[in-house]
């Protein structure tokens, strides 16, 4: 973990933005951490299915992520990393959506940590193969959330934030970036 990321982890009060990137629906959730206790701020989703142009979807993901950062001033972002699927085109689109959300965070110099879906599920439910419904119900219980959303992409975004809370302070919490310079330094082969 980088030094600036360590500083935010050690703060007694912080806000974590969790993002579940997608080109049909982007889910997101925010939690506040005070004195090592978390509380629910909000969760929602960005509906993108009505847009046919993939580039418009990417622009909207970027803009919504910037809007969330500017409105809530998160100290950290936790983002679900793409899982490996059989459909290469779907994987490319998902990777682009994740990259655009990460670029928005990096442009505002908010530290970002990626988590694999299994790690998020394990942190929330104790089962890396838990269903979306199981994750949602566990979050509902842990954060005293009233009614769950119809689509569970919002709870997936919230789960990324909660996973990051549970993993904060551990030495190996995932891939962390604190800005473009840190990203380039850690990924020299991705930049040409």
Curated annotation (Swiss-Prot):
Q: Does the keyword Nuclease apply?
A: yes
Question: Which InterPro entries does the record match to this protein?
Answer: RNaseH-like_sf, RNaseH_sf, X-over_junc_endoDNase_Mg_BS, X-over_junc_endoDNase_RuvC
This entry's Gene Ontology molecular function terms read: crossover junction DNA endonuclease activity; DNA binding; magnesium ion binding
- Sequence positions that bind Mg(2+) 2: 80
What's the record's note on cofactor binding? Binds 2 Mg(2+) ion per subunit.
What biological function has been recorded for the protein in this entry? The RuvA-RuvB-RuvC complex processes Holliday junction (HJ) DNA during genetic recombination and DNA repair. Endonuclease that resolves HJ intermediates. Cleaves cruciform DNA by making single-stranded nicks across the HJ at symmetrical positions within the homologous arms, yielding a 5'-phosphate and a 3'-hydroxyl group; requires a central core of homology in the junction. The consensus cleavage sequence is 5'-(A/T)TT(C/G)-3'. Cleavage occurs on the 3'-side of the TT dinucleotide at the point of strand exchange.
Q: What is this protein called?
A: Crossover junction endodeoxyribonuclease RuvC
According to its UniProt entry, this protein's organism is Christiangramia forsetii (strain DSM 17595 / CGMCC 1.15422 / KT0803)
Taxonomic lineage of this organism? Bacteria, Pseudomonadati, Bacteroidota, Flavobacteriia, Flavobacteriales
């Amino acid at each position: 973990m980088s030094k600036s990321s360590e500083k935010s982890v050690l703060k007694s009060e912080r806000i974590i933005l969790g993002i579940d990137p997608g080109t049909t629906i982007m889910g997101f959730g925010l939690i506040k951490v005070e004195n090592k206790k978390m509380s629910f701020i909000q969760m929602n989703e960005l509906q993108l299915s009505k847009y046919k142009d993939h580039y418009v979807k990417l622009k909207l993901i970027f803009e919504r992520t910037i809007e969330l950062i500017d409105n809530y001033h998160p100290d950290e972002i936790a983002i679900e990393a793409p899982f490996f699927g059989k459909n290469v085109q779907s994987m490319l689109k998902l990777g682009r959506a994740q990259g655009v959300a990460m670029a928005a965070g990096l442009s505002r110099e908010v530290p970002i940590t990626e988590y694999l879906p299994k790690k998020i599920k394990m942190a929330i439910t104790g089962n890396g193969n838990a269903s979306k419904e199981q994750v949602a119900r566990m979050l509902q219980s842990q954060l005293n959330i009233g009614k769950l959303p119809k689509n569970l992409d919002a709870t997936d975004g919230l789960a990324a934030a909660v996973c990051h809370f549970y993993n904060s302070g551990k030495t190996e919490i995932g891939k962390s970036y604190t800005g473009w310079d840190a990203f380039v330094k850690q990924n020299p082969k991705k930049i040409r």
